[in-house]
């Protein structure tokens, strides 16, 4: 017998209805898309690097994540569309920086979760 599933079917309608009501107002596609973008290791490395540096140019970021400038640029574009990073041009160089510092809280939460729960 599997102890991880119910042995009988019993629907708790009040709880199910409350949960469904809350879910109807939850923007699942956007939140899922946000986590999907951040689930890529290179994008996570980029965010981590930018959290610890005020700004980095694309060439520096490419070197840090050991990827081509084109690949790095693609990752940065995804992060920029998500509102995590922004950029500015200085002469011939394009610098990226963290746009919303709340991403730092999310990074810390991920690290703490891993250390406390997954250890």
UniProtKB/Swiss-Prot annotation:
<dbReference type="GO" id="GO:0046872">
    <property type="term" value="F:metal ion binding"/>
</dbReference>
<dbReference type="InterPro" id="IPR036390">
    <property type="entry name" value="WH_DNA-bd_sf"/>
</dbReference>
<protein>
    <recommendedName>
        <fullName>Cadmium resistance transcriptional regulatory protein CadC</fullName>
    </recommendedName>
</protein>
<dbReference type="InterPro" id="IPR001845">
    <property type="entry name" value="HTH_ArsR_DNA-bd_dom"/>
</dbReference>
<keyword id="KW-0105">Cadmium resistance</keyword>
<feature type="binding site">
    <location>
        <position position="6"/>
    </location>
    <ligand>
        <name>Cd(2+)</name>
    </ligand>
</feature>
<comment type="function">
    <text>Metal-binding repressor for the cad operon. Involved in resistance to heavy metals, such as cadmium, bismuth, zinc or lead. Metal binding causes the repressor to dissociate from the DNA.</text>
</comment>
<dbReference type="InterPro" id="IPR051011">
    <property type="entry name" value="Metal_resp_trans_reg"/>
</dbReference>
<dbReference type="GO" id="GO:0003677">
    <property type="term" value="F:DNA binding"/>
</dbReference>
<dbReference type="InterPro" id="IPR011991">
    <property type="entry name" value="ArsR-like_HTH"/>
</dbReference>
<keyword id="KW-0804">Transcription</keyword>
<dbReference type="InterPro" id="IPR018334">
    <property type="entry name" value="ArsR_HTH"/>
</dbReference>
<feature type="DNA-binding region" description="H-T-H motif">
    <location>
        <begin position="58"/>
        <end position="77"/>
    </location>
</feature>
<feature type="binding site">
    <location>
        <position position="59"/>
    </location>
    <ligand>
        <name>Cd(2+)</name>
    </ligand>
</feature>
<dbReference type="InterPro" id="IPR036388">
    <property type="entry name" value="WH-like_DNA-bd_sf"/>
</dbReference>
<keyword id="KW-0238">DNA-binding</keyword>
<comment type="subunit">
    <text>Homodimer.</text>
</comment>
<keyword id="KW-0614">Plasmid</keyword>
<keyword id="KW-0805">Transcription regulation</keyword>
<feature type="binding site">
    <location>
        <position position="57"/>
    </location>
    <ligand>
        <name>Cd(2+)</name>
    </ligand>
</feature>
<keyword id="KW-0479">Metal-binding</keyword>
<dbReference type="GO" id="GO:0003700">
    <property type="term" value="F:DNA-binding transcription factor activity"/>
</dbReference>
<feature type="binding site">
    <location>
        <position position="10"/>
    </location>
    <ligand>
        <name>Cd(2+)</name>
    </ligand>
</feature>
<keyword id="KW-0104">Cadmium</keyword>
<feature type="domain" description="HTH arsR-type">
    <location>
        <begin position="23"/>
        <end position="118"/>
    </location>
</feature>
<dbReference type="Pfam" id="PF01022">
    <property type="entry name" value="HTH_5"/>
</dbReference>
<dbReference type="GO" id="GO:0046686">
    <property type="term" value="P:response to cadmium ion"/>
</dbReference>
């Amino acid at each position: 017998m599997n102890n991880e599933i119910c042995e009988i079917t019993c629907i708790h309608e009040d709880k199910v209805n409350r949960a469904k009501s809350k879910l109807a107002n939850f923007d699942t596609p956007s939140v899922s898309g946000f986590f999907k973008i951040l689930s890529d290791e290179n994008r996570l490395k980029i965010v981590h690097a930018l959290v610890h540096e005020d700004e980095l140019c694309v060439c520096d970021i490419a070197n840090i994540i050991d990827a081509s400038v084109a690949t790095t640029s693609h990752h940065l574009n995804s992060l920029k569309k998500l509102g995590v990073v922004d950029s500015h041009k200085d002469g011939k160089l394009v610098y990226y920086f963290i746009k919303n510092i709340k991403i730092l809280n999310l990074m810390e939460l991920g690290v703490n979760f891993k250390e406390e729960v997954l250890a």
